Amino acid sequence: MRQLCRPLTLPHWWQDALLALPRIVCGYLLAANFGAAKFGLPWSPPDNNLGLFEVAFWFPQDVAAYGGIFALFPNFFAWMGAFSEAIGGVLLVLGLLTRPAALLVCCTMLVAMFMQQWQQGLWNMLPAAGFLWAALPALVLGSGRFGLDYLLTKPAVPRLRPGLVALAVAALLLPGCVQPAHDKTVVYLLDVSGHPNVQQVGLRGRDKPLSWDSDLLLTPIRKDSLYRAVVTTHTGYKVTEVKFTLNGDFELKEKANRRILFGPADTTVYRARFDVVPR
């Protein structure tokens, strides 16, 4: 273990500092943003409702769509991918277990590039490719002078016992699970009175079956006045985000999306006026 973690140091300290910069920035972005959004950490967004070390409910579904072995074990690969980003990012920042963390990040980014983003063109592959290139020097060189590995692998530091390392890893892995998801129904009641020439009233949103690309049409209760839609979402989140459209045009342009908080019951009623900012 000590040999695996012992970093290679360059002749001058500033060279190690220069190589530590992309490692630390990469790790911070993964741990604080990309990973924390789908893997339960103390700083994960509260609205995502993730328990500690839980992977977001939607991620195994995305992984299963890759096919092959990913479809056979979607929960495992989803959890490992999210773990690699979130916990691997923390380890990269600290320079602790740097090579294993960098290996996990590299594998995850390769999967993201070729299984998820390949069909969407080279431009969409750039974020994952950027994390891959940032992790590669850490995979080869370790943490350099600027990391905990440099301190912990010095001869004066007591050797880590493999049993204790295995116990720590097991303690970290055991709580991991997939976030539970439930059907949540929202009844949308939209007042469009005062808006002339109402031909079509739609709803777009973040969570399936809604999308930001196409309208779910609302049904008129009182034509040119009150419209209604009932949407059931299978989710583990506490909130969803939507916007209404009128004749294909978005409301609240250049303003934040509407945030609907799911109530404790399975059905929530949401009343709104078109293009009026909710209080």
Where do the PLM segments sit?
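Exposed beta-strand face motif in extracellular beta-rich ectodomains
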Residues: 238-242
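Extended, low-polarity transmembrane helix blocks
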Residues: 1-52, 72-83, 87, 94-178
